[in-house]
């Protein structure tokens, strides 16, 4: 967050993450959020343990609030980042992991206008997002 960066400065490269307070989703992240804790492991040699965290939460909104409050550094999906939030991307040259998204509905509704319009809207929005 901007609060964190004003207080501690931004990491310049992945090695700087070794000295940053990291916030993680926790050990039981759902499969849809696989690799959400990638700041703990990026750049870490395979024989080393993941970076330590100062806080683990069990939902993505809690992760957002902790990062936003300047508690530490963590990973959020793009769709949670809005211009009105005091967040700042760090290490922009590094792409985080991506996540698959599924739109599930009853087969008998496949050809309805309502489902088609909503599907088109979701596809348009999802193309803008990354995790």
Task: Identify the residue ranges that each predicted region occupies.
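Short amphipathic alpha-helical coupling segments at ligand-binding clamshell hinges
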Residues: 110-124
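C-terminal regulatory
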Residues: 1-101, 127-131
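A cross-family signal for key residues in well-ordered alpha-helices
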Residues: 64, 105, 119
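A bilobed periplasmic-binding-protein/Venus flytrap-type ligand-binding module shared by bacterial periplasmic
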Residues: 101-111
């Amino acid at each position: 967050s901007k609060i964190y960066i004003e207080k501690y400065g931004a990491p310049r490269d992945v090695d700087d993450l070794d000295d940053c307070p990291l916030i993680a989703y926790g050990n039981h992240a759902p499969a849809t959020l696989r690799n959400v804790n990638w700041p703990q492991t990026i750049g870490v040699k395979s024989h080393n343990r993941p970076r330590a965290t100062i806080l683990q939460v069990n939902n993505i909104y809690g992760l957002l609030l902790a990062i936003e409050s300047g508690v530490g550094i963590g990973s959020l999906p793009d769709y949670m980042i809005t211009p009105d939030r005091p967040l700042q991307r760090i290490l922009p040259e590094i792409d985080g992991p991506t996540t698959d998204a599924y739109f599930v509905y009853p087969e008998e509704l496949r050809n309805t206008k309502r489902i088609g319009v909503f599907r088109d809207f979701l596809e348009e929005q999802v193309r803008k997002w990354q995790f």
